[in-house]
């Protein structure tokens, strides 16, 4: 059984996207990272421990993140739609016929958009830490993380190592501004209109102590993605898949089978 992880870059939609791949199972699974995220910083325990006999696991770095640079990351109004198309086109380029999605935070939003827009290509989906719209409360939360010098050392360090301080700090500010754009749309809409179009079996995991995603966001997605299942982790915060990796991985494996 090979536990090796390969990394490569492949040309997709005019950029070179970096990804890591492991396992040799029939069932292809794409890991979608959060803001400023990458496979290596966001999904260590999943790349290492998800069942390699059952799954072929791919973790991608969205354009401008991780090792998918250049280009520098930017945030046009449709940046999440662009990520969704890039992600699906990456997996098609790698010759996967169908794929399940594991999306964290922004990656969860990207997964929802991909499942809605490319329903025939998506097998199953697990999302956590995502939101379908922006509120005043969210705006305050995001302003609170705008200045990376105020982040905890533990959260900041891996990203600083990956990007260098300047790119990391600048891109975080750009991300906050990028998210603000949704405040100007009716109801702060990010992807509300797409939720009813999701057809695949969907598991929503929520850490009840997540400081970044208030509970109403989760209930909204659960209500509007038909047939979705909600699993609550009472002690989970935003990074529940890292903090409670074994519990999370088992949950995911059971759901995907």
Placement of each model-derived feature along the sequence:
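Short beta-strand/loop motif that positions the catalytic acidic residue
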Residues: 198, 204-206
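Active-site nucleophile elbow and catalytic-triad environment of alpha/beta-hydrolase enzymes
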Residues: 177-194
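Active-site loop/oxyanion-hole signature of alpha/beta-hydrolase fold enzymes
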Residues: 44, 59-98, 102, 250
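Catalytic histidine-centered segment of alpha/beta-hydrolase-like enzymes
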Residues: 236-249
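Acidic catalytic loop of the alpha/beta-hydrolase fold
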Residues: 209-213, 238
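Catalytic histidine neighborhood in serine/cysteine hydrolases
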Residues: 222-239, 254
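Flexible "cap/lid" loop of the alpha/beta hydrolase fold
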Residues: 109-154
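Conserved HGGG/HGGXW glycine-rich cap/lid loop of the alpha/beta-hydrolase fold
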Residues: 15-70
